[in-house]
Regions:
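Short hydrophobic/aromatic-rich motifs at helix boundaries and adjacent loops
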Residues: 1, 91, 415-416
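Extracellular glycan-recognition regions
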Residues: 14-207
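Sequence signature of WD/YWTD-type beta-propeller architectures
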Residues: 204-488
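Alpha-helical interaction segments
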Residues: 2, 44-46, 53, 370, ...
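Bacterial Sec-dependent N-terminal signal peptides
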Residues: 1-14
């Protein structure tokens, strides 16, 4: 039995010899038709597919599928047949709204060259984006839809599946399609992959205990909004800073500051001596030689200290607390921070050497997150003085305070890019109070001179995602932390 959808060149069939799946066919236009062979003895599927790509706003590939609803996962061993072909050919575990070439979808894609990515199109006709994993050429992959979030796990040879890090938010209407796909990345040829040890599981909603937290350190390219996983852990990590030379990242975890070198998967502790209760407000001096930390070891009140980036006994800067570091002036002479004095949180500055602090804001409600513009003319901050949390800026002496964002989101932690062109910030939904952890949030970006606000990423995060400056030195990328709650 066969039929055609409205999309020209897209045909699908249902066949009783497809094992646990219901149908298969070419999605989009493929000059060479694909096929599926099911080995009922081995319970494996050999899928041949053509198609130009699964990317941009539409896809072309061969798809073996079944309809499902609810929270579900699909896992399989994946093996390419043949060593040649296009390095960008894709063998995929696919979750898809429908069989239209421009459908919303997510897939765990193993490329011919070994690159493995969690790819997605949030809605029909949108551009495709991806989260690249640091795990190359896995032998087994799993894609999981839990609520409105999709994530991926991977396994190398002789290893167990492990989280690949990162997840994204996508809304699919039930029922939707789940299955296996192959794209040759060249419409003139076909490629073949074997999928075996297939598991399709319903994810139970029962909670047997407290969920476990998974933290992922990621970067996002500003131009493409594609994401790359650098590090994933079951520890709680927060607030990345990018080094001035671009060679490493900092983050805090369990009261300590860690340094992760480029291409390394083993963070190293920076020796902060007695400061062992560091929070997520820390960052580097303009020359990259000094580190500012906010530590709560003394009387559980956050105080600001400075130490060499190599580590050493910290030097106290603020004698009053709580004080939370957020910005370093481009000339290296002044620190900006949020502090509570007499029951009110406002923005303050203080010389790097310490001394008398200067109060820059003094209005009812919280003012937080001060960060300097790269030319040293302005301090950007977030304030709830108008009833919701919005982005503001002022001159460095506190004068000329003006509102930058005016929308239905609660916007936090504005960070100007090093080239002075962009402001990135964290946005919560309008009914969220404060900046809690483990919420649906967005990373958003806008031109410094005003203009359209665009979404960089929708993720599960909040507190700890981008509390402090995290731009790459060339302004092309942003570092952040995303989170995932895993039921035991």
């Amino acid at each position: 039995m066969a039929w055609s959808l409205m999309n020209i060149g897209t045909a699908f069939s249902q066949n009783a010899s497809l094992g646990i799946f219901e149908g298969n066919g070419d999605v989009g236009t493929s000059l060479k038709p694909g096929s599926v062979h099911y080995d009922s003895t081995q319970k494996s599927y050999t899928i041949t597919g053509g198609g130009e790509n699964m990317w941009f706003t539409k896809d072309a590939f061969h798809f073996l599928w079944k309809k499902v609803s609810g929270n579900v996962s699909l896992a399989a061993d994946i093996q390419w047949i043949g060593t040649g072909g296009n390095p960008h050919r894709k063998a995929c575990l696919v979750i898809r709204q429908n069989l239209d070439p421009s459908s919303a979808y997510a897939d765990a894609a193993v490329h011919g060259e070994g690159l493995t990515s969690l790819q997605y199109r949030s809605s029909a006709g949108d551009l495709t984006h991806e989260i690249q994993s640091y795990i190359k050429a896995p032998v087994r992959a799993r894609i999981e839809k839990n609520g409105n979030y999709v994530s991926m796990s991977l396994a190398r040879e002789n290893e167990e599946l492990q989280p690949a890090g990162g997840s994204f938010r996508i809304q699919l209407t039930e029922p939707f399609y789940i299955g296996l796909g192959v794209c040759s990345h060249d419409s003139n040829v076909v490629e073949t992959a074997v999928f075996s040890h297939i598991e399709i599981k319903t994810i139970e909603s029962k909670k047997l205990g407290e969920p476990m937290l998974e933290s992922t350190l990621e970067t996002i390219a500003i131009a493409s909004t594609d994401r790359k996983v650098l590090y994933t852990t079951r520890d709680h990590i927060e607030a990345p800073n990018w080094s001035r030379d671009g060679k490493y990242l900092l983050f805090n975890s369990n009261g300590l500051i860690y340094r992760l070198e480029a291409n390394s998967k083993t963070p190293q502790v920076i020796d902060t001596r007695l400061a062992i209760h560091c929070n997520n407000d820390h960052g580097l001096s303009p020359d990259g030689k000094l580190l500012a930390i906010s530590d709560q070891s003394k009387d559980n009140k956050s105080l600001i200290y400075i130490l060499p980036i190599e580590g050493r006994e910290p030097r106290l800067v603020t004698s009053l607390g709580p004080s939370y570091w957020h910005g370093w002036s481009p000339d290296g002479k002044t620190l900006a921070y949020c502090a509570e004095r007499k029951g009110q949180y406002d923005i303050y500055t203080i010389p790097v050497e310490g001394g008398e602090e200067k109060q820059l804001t003094n209005v009812p409600g919280l003012d937080d997150g001060p960060d300097y513009s790269p030319d040293g003319q302005y301090i950007y901050f977030n304030s709830e003085r108008t009833g919701s949390m919005q982005i503001w800026r002022m001159k460095t002496d506190g004068s000329g305070q003006e509102q930058i964002t005016k929308d239905d989101c609660n916007n936090w932690f504005a960070h100007p890019s090093p080239d002075g062109k962009w402001i990135v910030f964290l946005s919560y939904e309008k009914d969220v109070k404060g900046h809690p952890a483990n919420k649906d949030v967005m990373l958003r970006i806008m031109p410094v001179g005003g203009g359209e606000i665009k979404v960089l990423a929708k993720l599960f995060g909040g507190q700890g995602t981008i509390n402090v400056p995290s731009w790459s030195p060339d302004s092309n990328n942003l570092a952040f932390v995303s989170y995932r709650l895993i039921n035991p």
